[in-house]
Structure formats: C-alpha cells, structure tokens
Amino acid sequence: MTSSPSTVSTTLLSILRDDLNIDLTRVTPDARLVDDVGLDSVAFAVGMVAIEERLGVALSEEELLTCDTVGELEAAIAAKYRDE
C-alpha cells in the first residue's frame, strides 16, 4: 500500500471537515486534537472509522490516543502505510 504525505494530509483534512464538522481554520500540524481542534471520544471513534474507510489504514484506539496533535496523527497514519 502506498500513499504520499500530501494524500494523507488532504484526506485527513477532508475527514476532519466532512465527517467531524471541524472548522479547518483551527487545524494546523501543531493543533492539539482535543484542546485546539475540539475532538471528543465520539469524534475519535468516527475518525477511526473514516480513516480506515478512506485511507485503508486501521489505527488502534491506543495508537490514536497517543496522538496529541494533527501532525502526530498524520505521522501515525503515514507510519502505518510504511509498515504494510
């Protein structure tokens, strides 16, 4: 499975905007998922499903919860691509 960093980033932004109704003006690589972006446990669950459906990458709950920022989440997704 291959994907470029820009594809991961673009798709993640799309998920945040379309699936989670996040205002993308609040989203930067350093934005904290909970404090800055405003994700809660329901949003994390919806996000996990959307990431798997759109990117074909299954993140465990543990992997997702270790991501504090948008950039860390992008890196975790990209790492899954490298591992597969």
From Swiss-Prot:
Domain of life: Bacteria
Location in the cell: Cytoplasm
Pathway where this protein functions: Siderophore biosynthesis; mycobactin biosynthesis
PROSITE patterns to which the protein is assigned, alphabetical: CARRIER
Carrier domain sequence ranges: 6-81
Positions bearing O-(pantetheine 4'-phosphoryl)serine: S41
Gene3D superfamilies for the chain: ACP-like
SUPFAM superfamilies reported for this sequence: ACP-like
Conditions for induction: Induced by iron starvation conditions. Transcriptionally repressed by IdeR and iron.
NCBIfam families: PRK05883.1
Biological role: Acyl carrier protein involved in the formation of acyl-S-ACP intermediates within the mycobactin biosynthesis process. The aliphatic chains carried by ACP are subsequently transferred on to the mycobactin core by MbtK.
Protein name as it appears in the record: Acyl carrier protein MbtL
Source species: Mycobacterium tuberculosis (strain ATCC 25618 / H37Rv)
